[in-house]
Amino acid sequence: MEKTYNPQDIEQPLYEHWEKQGYFKPNGDESQESFCIMIPPPNVTGSLHMGHAFQQTIMDTMIRYQRMQGKNTLWQVGTDHAGIATQMVVERKIAAEEGKTRHDYGREAFIDKIWEWKAESGGTITRQMRRLGNSVDWERERFTMDEGLSNAVKEVFVRLYKEDLIYRGKRLVNWDPKLRTAISDLEVENRESKGSMWHIRYPLADGAKTADGKDYLVVATTRPETLLGDTGVAVNPEDPRYKDLIGKYVILPLVNRRIPIVGDEHADMEKGTGCVKITPAHDFNDYEVGKRHALPMINILTFDGDIRESAQVFDTKGNESDVYSSEIPAEFQKLERFAARKAVVAAVDALGLLEEIKPHDLTVPYGDRGGVVIEPMLTDQWYVRADVLAKPAVEAVENGDIQFVPKQYENMYFSWMRDIQDWCISRQLWWGHRIPAWYDEAGNVYVGRNEEEVRKENNLGADVALRQDEDVLDTWFSSALWTFSTLGWPENTDALRQFHPTSVMVSGFDIIFFWIARMIMMTMHFIKDENGKPQVPFHTVYMTGLIRDDEGQKMSKSKGNVIDPLDMVDGISLPELLEKRTGNMMQPQLADKIRKRTEKQFPNGIEPHGTDALRFTLAALASTGRDINWDMKRLEGYRNFCNKLWNASRFVLMNTEGQDCGFNGGEMTLSLADRWILAEFNQTIKAYREALDSFRFDIAAGILYEFTWNQFCDWYLELTKPVMNGGTEAELRGTRHTLVTVLEGLLRLAHPIIPFITETIWQRVKVLCGITADTIMLQPFPQYDASQVDEAALADTEWLKQAIVAVRNIRAEMNIAPGKPLELLLRGCSADAERRVNENRGFLQTLARLESITVLPADDKGPVSVTKIIDGAELLIPMAGLINKEDELARLAKEVAKIEGEISRIENKLANEGFVARAPEAVIAKEREKLEGYAEAKAKLIEQQAVIAAL
């Protein structure tokens, strides 16, 4: 084997070989259980980020683990067309490169442009997924807008429409005036901001007066520009100030519209003035009040967020109405919405109707992609009736057909599902699945799979002009069908029969509503088992946390703290990293701050660590919490682990290749160490499998690390040396056999998490075991064998380790060179301790570097020694001639003084109120941790001083 482990040389060629050989495909053995995971489809034109790397590592670990258990295993891969995100990227691209908008291209040509862009950049993410080692079946790769999936989408839309579960309605939606499309509640980001509350007088009509004799009501509002669309004023029916005015009217300032005063709980007696203006077409709460009191709806805004030249007036059901005039005063027409706000306030003030302006804290909704203030807008949209679909989806989780891991996420799911709103599925975009609905000139709507079907079903001749709905479906509509559409539905395919319901869905908790809930609803509605019972899309939902940076901040381009997973695999220089973090920024003014932070964090760029080290780190961080802080130190630690495994394997091969390892018969004697490592390894298999079976990848990674590093490399390989240097033929055969057996099993055990290094080493080790199979990927996963767990060997070896560690600690504490042979005395030995010494003198002398071992009677004082208590004996190392008492005490005093200096420096820092107030929580915690460490070190040194002073 190469002297040093170099992941760059082995990973990519190995992956290409695996893919070419078809190892990622299901084995097709229907006598075996099936295991299937659907990959959450990443955006087709996106690139791999830490969240992808994290979730895909977890999925690949599960897939490889189940495949090695002989299951018929499919990891279904595919990408998402990502409507709004992809359209924005291409719009920005043509604006930058050609100075054009999508309207210059027209719909058809612009969509062609997006397909071109997909062809050009659509391979990026799948190339990157290959770099991660993902063992997905690439031959089955799907795209949410490929022909098969597009047919499934149309099929679902048409069936739901025919069942009256999809309808078209005039409703209020979150409207993004910049992107000119409806967006979902989940894409709205609420930001706190300082604003004003304007108090405006609305004159009472017909000579009416308030309880205290005023001829007007004062209405408080944070959005005076919407006054132009008011159709009512609400007061609380219990409010003694106004309840007698319910049913009377006010005259709307500026517009002179006569609008009613209604009694509604929505008006809070304690808030503002107790009178609330009602604008059903421009506020979600007002829309509900309007429905309760049959108030008309007046839309005053264009889709760009400007004031219209004439208003649109609708009745409560959304039909056009002439109950009010559509006139808007000329001075406000065509004004941008925030300019209109100023103009309306000025006009009201000029009439003497502005009572006061108060500062007011408010929450303003912004679109998370367009970045502008969202406008509630009355539009025609398509909706899915969600309550009917939600009922079985709630029951599936209640009765355990679907389980959430960790379980607490069920509550989040229930709270949303039990209060579910109808789902607005239309988007005013060009890129996506176009809604399969057509209109004739009279405005009648026809829904069908294509125009031909529509004409045939509705007997529409060629003379009837039809135009297709311009809108496309919300991207999440097609994603909701992902588990079954990818397997060939609506056809009844073999794949659907074998792999559905799928086994596990791995997802971030942030899309539990966007995606998980909608998959459950859609799948259970459309997929039934042979008894007609609704099928769930998956049996288990494994929720991951979000990966944040080392300070717990969310990774984002604007914070400049994004780490590209492949930069950790391949390494990246500082200049390249800076360019990546500060190039093409939306907010270039942040570049300087980002540059400084990056230079501080990565003064030499990022070293290459290889894919296996990245995967091991991600698995080790996969705790059940919501947030996971990324830690470069852990990554370095797991790269060191890979080096350690490589070097240990070289040691094993150097001692076994070309030797008799006992695989072809011949007498074998197993040493205590051999019996011990086989017992340890079997206990490790048991615990590791339990961790993987319960989705505790962090615990599994810890078990693997601890066994490999501490037991196998640090202890067992050392314990084999006495046999290697002087054992009998049978002993040599036994130890070589054990070395090879444990290493080969360990490689299979570790393979799901670190596939590349394990396959590479295994190809060398398999020869020694007489294995002829081609790949570790399809080898059986190790199974626990209770007969290999020799309790006596475990107990005896733990005792030997305890004795060896005690001697090593005395060397370190007394500053004695590691190579200097020592005398060891054991006093007051129990029978077990004495037996262990006599049976294992060779081990003890070699590993603890001992000249001699002497057992003393319990009452023998012995020479001046440093003593440690171990199980069943006192361990003494005579100090004569080993240390100079005065020099050693002086050295320790110096060490203590140095540590005291550090302690007082940190104590002063933590006593400084300015520092504590300003420094981030993580920094303060680090300082406290350092302080604890120094205090412990000081206590140890003082203890040593006492020991030496007593010599």
Curated annotation (Swiss-Prot):
One GO term in the molecular function aspect is: valine-tRNA ligase activity
Matching InterPro entries: aa-tRNA-synth_I_CS, aa-tRNA-synth_Ia, Anticodon_Ia_Val, M/V/L/I-tRNA-synth_anticd-bd, Rossmann-like_a/b/a_fold, tRNA-bd_arm, tRNAsynth_Ia_anticodon-bd, Val-tRNA_synth_C_sf
Q: Does Protein biosynthesis appear among the keywords?
A: yes
Signal sequence extent: none
Q: Coiled coil: which residue ranges?
A: 880-944
Q: Where is this motif: 'HIGH' region?
A: 42-52
Q: Which residues bind ATP?
A: K557
A cellular component term from Gene Ontology for this protein is: cytosol
* UniProt keyword annotations, A-Z: Aminoacyl-tRNA synthetase, ATP-binding, Coiled coil, Cytoplasm, Ligase, Nucleotide-binding, Protein biosynthesis
Instruction: Detail the disulphide connectivity of this chain as listed in its UniProt entry.
Output: none
Main localization is: cytoplasm
Q: Which Pfam families match?
A: Anticodon_1, tRNA-synt_1, Val_tRNA-synt_C
Which CDD domains does the record associate with it?
Anticodon_Ia_Val, ValRS_core
Matching entries from Gene3D superfamilies are given as: HUPs, Isoleucyl-tRNA Synthetase, Domain 1, Valyl-tRNA synthetase, C-terminal domain, Valyl/Leucyl/Isoleucyl-tRNA synthetase, editing domain
**Residue positions of motif 'KMSKS' region:** 554-558
Return the EC number: 6.1.1.9
Q: Which reaction does it catalyse?
A: tRNA(Val) + L-valine + ATP = L-valyl-tRNA(Val) + AMP + diphosphate
- Localization per record: Cytoplasm
What processes in GO biological process is this protein linked to?
Answer: valyl-tRNA aminoacylation
- Complexes and interactors: Monomer.
Q: What is known of its domains?
A: ValRS has two distinct active sites: one for aminoacylation and one for editing. The misactivated threonine is translocated from the active site to the editing site.
The UniProt function text for this chain reads: Catalyzes the attachment of valine to tRNA(Val). As ValRS can inadvertently accommodate and process structurally similar amino acids such as threonine, to avoid such errors, it has a 'posttransfer' editing activity that hydrolyzes mischarged Thr-tRNA(Val) in a tRNA-dependent manner.
The record's similarity note reads: Belongs to the class-I aminoacyl-tRNA synthetase family. ValS type 1 subfamily.
What protein is this chain from?
Answer: Valine--tRNA ligase
| Organism, as annotated | Shigella sonnei (strain Ss046)
Q: What is the lineage of its organism?
A: Bacteria, Pseudomonadati, Pseudomonadota, Gammaproteobacteria, Enterobacterales
